[in-house]
């Protein structure tokens, strides 16, 4: 999301199945739900440019489990309204892949965050999983302090 710590990109299919994998719904099932929500709230079909499903990719240590990432997904849903429905951990390069639904259920529109909100989201993930702060994030001190109080 910010300077290579967490990268969010548009995704148009399911995550690859790995030995450490969790799924609440398939991609096609979630797209049907998203289309229904958008039609219900906005009364028009979703556009092709709508980035309703995005994949979040970030480095994790070998000790991180799928259960910890499921707990993270619940916290992200509660705090940021983004709903994770698939998780995979690739142990060859120790990366976590999480597939998120970025549609606001109240408005039917895609959720977007500005730079400050993106940094806060990234710090939230790093602190939730007790991951080390990358070197290029020294200027994030004030966002780190936000979670202390």
Where are the model-predicted features located?
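N-terminal nicking endonuclease/strand-transfer module with a His-rich metal-binding environment
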Residues: 1-149
């Amino acid at each position: 999301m910010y300077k290579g710590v967490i990268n969010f990109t548009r995704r148009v299919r399911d995550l690859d199945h790995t030995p450490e994998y969790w799924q609440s719904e398939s991609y096609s099932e979630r797209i049907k739900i998203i289309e229904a929500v958008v039609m219900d709230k906005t009364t028009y079909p979703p556009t092709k440019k709508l980035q309703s499903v995005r994949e979040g990719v970030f480095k994790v240590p070998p000790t991180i489990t799928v259960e910890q990432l499921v707990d993270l997904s619940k916290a992200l849903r509660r705090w940021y309204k983004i709903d994770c429905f698939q998780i995979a951990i690739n142990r060859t390069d120790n990366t976590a892949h999480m597939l998120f639904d970025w549609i606001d259920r109240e408005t039917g529109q895609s959720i977007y965050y500005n730079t400050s909100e993106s940094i806060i989201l990234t710090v939230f993930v790093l602190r939730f999983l007790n991951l080390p702060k990358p070197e290029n994030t020294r200027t994030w001190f004030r966002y780190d302090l936000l979670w202390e109080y």
